[in-house]
Amino acid sequence: MERAMEQLNRLTRSLRRARTVELPDDNETAVYTLMPMVMADQHRSVSELLSNSKFDVNYAFGRVKRSLLHIAANCGSVECLVLLLKKGANPNYQDISGCTPLHLAARNGQKKCMSKLLEYSADVNICNNEGLTAIHWLAVNGRTELLHDLVQHVSNVDVEDAMGQTALHVACQNGHKTTVQCLLDSGADINRPNVSGATPLYFACSHGQRDTAQILLMRGAKYLPDKNGITPLDLCVQGGYGETCEVLIQYHPRLFQTIIQMTQNEDLRENMLRQVLEHLSQQSESQYLKILTSLAEVATTNGHKLLSLSSNYEAQMKSLLRIVRIFCHVFRIGPSSPSNGNDMGYNGNKTPRSQVFKVRKVYDVVRKIDVKEMNFTKHAFINQTSHEQEPLELLWHSLDEWLVLIATELMKNKRDSANITSILLKQKGPDHQDATPTPSFAAAGTESRKELSTDTGDSKTYEVAGKQEAYADCQDVISMTANRLSAVIQAFYMCCSCQMPQGMTSPRFIEFVCKHDDVLKCFVNRNPKIIFDHFHFLLECPELMSRFMHIIKAQPFKDRCEWFYEHLHSGQPDSDMVHRPVNENDILLVHRDSIFRSSCEVVSKANCAKLKQGIAVRFHGEEGMGQGVVREWFDILSSEIVNPDYALFTQSADGTTFQPNSNSSVNPDHLNYFRFAGQILGLALNHRQLVNIYFTRSFYKHILGIPVNYQDVASIDPEYAKNLQWILDNDISDLGLELTFSVETDVFGAMEEVPLKPGGASILVTQENKAEYVQLVTELRMTRAIQPQINAFLQGFHMFIPPSLIQLFDEYELELLLSGMPEIDVNDWLKNTEYTSGYERGDQVIQWFWDVVEELTQEERVLLLQFVTGSSRVPHGGFAHIMGGSGLQNFTIAAVPYTANLLPTSSTCINMLKLPEYPSKEILKDRLLVALHCGSYGYTMA
């Protein structure tokens, strides 16, 4: 009966308290009953359960083997913690990681729990398995108030963890100012190194903790490297921590020059150096000028080393350009930058920055250059005793002297080569003059010198030998100096450009290029890759482009494509992320049933800069995303742009290309749509997406800014083009045509007379002015009639593709960039080819020709097709459907008598290749490739 009553009472208490009132007998089960109560600090319930139980309060459970005292300390359950301590819980019991309850209380900032644990003799010096004590945990988390209480019980405030780090190390690394001050006040060793030799200052700088670094330096911390020689400044620069660098320089001024010298270290990231110097330059005008002056001096030193032929070209070139890039960056962000309207000329003196580079020194430099027994020596005297000289001006002066010297030698040897030729011809005698080619002095070498020097003893022979040797030496010097000088020229261009507002070219640099035009062209002709390595200004400056465009366009198409995309993306925030995924808010959401209009609307509202970096499209109601969807979007828009319903483009006479519609104004939104069409093609080119659309040659010329000519008229009116050709080919003086400089044009059914020039209706076309008439009427048909459409298209296109970059290509190459390389079926080509003027299918030359075509690359086959037909495409249906000037016209090969060095030519209006009767397959292939790559339309000799 008594037992039953006791069970009933336990049941009643349990139901009232909604918990058990008696712990299980085994510790494992009991501890999981108590743990949630301890976590909630339900000390009365815990006390009641423990009072009638044999539970071991030090029982360790779980994966990390912690006791309930660990749980209470970790959660801040101070009442339960005290209860457990009174019940005999061990305050120094360590879990599997070596942590005591005091460690956990310190880590989580449980102040009351820490106090009670200390009352019950918790050992503050116990380390966990990683060597961390309670004060380490307080320092990591910046719990200064608790640290004040704890350090009174600590015997060694510099106790180290497994890596030799003290509490001061970790407090400095995490930027806890008051904690650092507390530890220092408590006697922490301010210069104590860890196992790798890193001091607290080193730790502060490693994470850019400016304030803790300043406290340490104020308290006398030493500037010490670690065991690997890495200094606190190294860490600051590596992380781009400008503010911390500023503090280091404040206490150690010598470090300023160390930072400047770091600009030569290619192992340091350039953008981090820029960040540091940018911050330092913003502190004061004097600091800004000091940085620029120092950078200019280092750049000058590196530039002169680069001009020294004994230095390592690759290393010195990279160092110079790196320093100059950093210099220009700092220069631009100054308080009186060009964008703010201030004159930044090197030679000016209106702004403080005109004094940036000036240093008061007396220079007396004598430079002597003697290369491979050269017959000339350069003495450059720079005497400055009465005025200040800008450091960089010394480098530019040396550059100028080098270029003048080379120009002089080139001119001298050019005269000598003419004299040598004359002497050689006289020695050979009149019977040999016709058979003796002019010597190629670019290839003059040792053998030619030996031949000349071992002649009969004629004094003229030795004269020739000496001059040839001098010429060869000059060529050696150019070979050794061209790249070095080109790198310095690039540096000069960068410095000139940083003084100018965006988009403007420095007049000083233009003058420099004009002055040294011959030498620069010599460099480019000898090594065309210089254009892409150092002579970027040729493409970035419209004023200079025309002078070198023929050289630029002579470079391989592949090289120009690589340069194009490299510079197209170079101005973006992160050129490595051009094709990165875009933000959800930047996705172009379009409707399939109105894809043209909806795409036009969303693209016009989108951020152009973001579209350049990445593009994503989603069709309304569909989940698909990714490059496949983008590809489909461009494909569909390619067809929609030339959809007759929009009246934007009309099909040309060849049936495969399109031309802007001069009557597109029937669509009220036609100019908006033309701008959108330009945006789509610009976007496609930017992201290397091909479009399935082809335009007339004249339209590609409009995109490139190339003037059209009368031959372009054939794409829209072949018969009229033939008439223009006839006028040019024949004397019209006595024909009585009575043409004037005006034409009649059908404007929506009404005939209007349009003057080709002011007063054109009263100016007769004559034999003398007929060429002008043909050009003006061509411009009317091909340009003036569609000028608004062209302008709108280019406005959209240039949002994504700068005009200066696209001019790298001709109209044929632009088509390849936009629409890709067409596939050419050689068998179909052969089957639909005709032969004339003496050739037949079985002739040896014809067999060689087709063997060569089989050996050509796909790109070269396209060039051949363009060369003969004027088009890179095969029409739908194959070669049987190729159009000529008067309709269908098969590819035709005509025989031409062979003479030495004769190139193939073509007549594109009748798709005819005029192929000389070459004596061998090798000569045929060589001459054909020369013609294709040199574009010998109308040429007859190599």
Swiss-Prot record:
<keyword id="KW-0040">ANK repeat</keyword>
<comment type="pathway">
    <text>Protein modification; protein ubiquitination.</text>
</comment>
<dbReference type="InterPro" id="IPR000569">
    <property type="entry name" value="HECT_dom"/>
</dbReference>
<keyword id="KW-0256">Endoplasmic reticulum</keyword>
<dbReference type="Pfam" id="PF12796">
    <property type="entry name" value="Ank_2"/>
</dbReference>
<dbReference type="GO" id="GO:0032580">
    <property type="term" value="C:Golgi cisterna membrane"/>
</dbReference>
<dbReference type="InterPro" id="IPR050409">
    <property type="entry name" value="E3_ubiq-protein_ligase"/>
</dbReference>
<dbReference type="Pfam" id="PF00632">
    <property type="entry name" value="HECT"/>
</dbReference>
<dbReference type="GO" id="GO:0005634">
    <property type="term" value="C:nucleus"/>
</dbReference>
<feature type="repeat" description="ANK 6">
    <location>
        <begin position="196"/>
        <end position="226"/>
    </location>
</feature>
<dbReference type="GO" id="GO:0005737">
    <property type="term" value="C:cytoplasm"/>
</dbReference>
<keyword id="KW-0963">Cytoplasm</keyword>
<feature type="domain" description="HECT">
    <location>
        <begin position="607"/>
        <end position="942"/>
    </location>
</feature>
<feature type="repeat" description="ANK 5">
    <location>
        <begin position="163"/>
        <end position="192"/>
    </location>
</feature>
<dbReference type="GO" id="GO:0005783">
    <property type="term" value="C:endoplasmic reticulum"/>
</dbReference>
<feature type="region of interest" description="Disordered">
    <location>
        <begin position="428"/>
        <end position="459"/>
    </location>
</feature>
<feature type="compositionally biased region" description="Basic and acidic residues">
    <location>
        <begin position="447"/>
        <end position="459"/>
    </location>
</feature>
<dbReference type="InterPro" id="IPR002110">
    <property type="entry name" value="Ankyrin_rpt"/>
</dbReference>
<dbReference type="InterPro" id="IPR035983">
    <property type="entry name" value="Hect_E3_ubiquitin_ligase"/>
</dbReference>
<dbReference type="InterPro" id="IPR036770">
    <property type="entry name" value="Ankyrin_rpt-contain_sf"/>
</dbReference>
<keyword id="KW-0131">Cell cycle</keyword>
<feature type="active site" description="Glycyl thioester intermediate">
    <location>
        <position position="909"/>
    </location>
</feature>
<keyword id="KW-0472">Membrane</keyword>
<dbReference type="GO" id="GO:0030334">
    <property type="term" value="P:regulation of cell migration"/>
</dbReference>
<dbReference type="GO" id="GO:0006511">
    <property type="term" value="P:ubiquitin-dependent protein catabolic process"/>
</dbReference>
<keyword id="KW-0833">Ubl conjugation pathway</keyword>
<dbReference type="GO" id="GO:0061025">
    <property type="term" value="P:membrane fusion"/>
</dbReference>
<dbReference type="Pfam" id="PF13857">
    <property type="entry name" value="Ank_5"/>
</dbReference>
<protein>
    <recommendedName>
        <fullName>E3 ubiquitin-protein ligase HACE1</fullName>
        <ecNumber>2.3.2.26</ecNumber>
    </recommendedName>
</protein>
<keyword id="KW-0677">Repeat</keyword>
<dbReference type="GO" id="GO:0007030">
    <property type="term" value="P:Golgi organization"/>
</dbReference>
<keyword id="KW-0808">Transferase</keyword>
<keyword id="KW-0333">Golgi apparatus</keyword>
<feature type="repeat" description="ANK 2">
    <location>
        <begin position="64"/>
        <end position="93"/>
    </location>
</feature>
<feature type="repeat" description="ANK 7">
    <location>
        <begin position="228"/>
        <end position="253"/>
    </location>
</feature>
<dbReference type="GO" id="GO:0061630">
    <property type="term" value="F:ubiquitin protein ligase activity"/>
</dbReference>
<dbReference type="GO" id="GO:0000139">
    <property type="term" value="C:Golgi membrane"/>
</dbReference>
<comment type="function">
    <text>E3 ubiquitin-protein ligase involved in Golgi membrane fusion and regulation of small GTPases. Acts as a regulator of Golgi membrane dynamics during the cell cycle: recruited to Golgi membrane by Rab proteins and regulates postmitotic Golgi membrane fusion. Acts by mediating ubiquitination during mitotic Golgi disassembly, ubiquitination serving as a signal for Golgi reassembly later, after cell division.</text>
</comment>
<dbReference type="GO" id="GO:0004842">
    <property type="term" value="F:ubiquitin-protein transferase activity"/>
</dbReference>
<dbReference type="GO" id="GO:0031267">
    <property type="term" value="F:small GTPase binding"/>
</dbReference>
<feature type="repeat" description="ANK 4">
    <location>
        <begin position="130"/>
        <end position="159"/>
    </location>
</feature>
<dbReference type="GO" id="GO:0070936">
    <property type="term" value="P:protein K48-linked ubiquitination"/>
</dbReference>
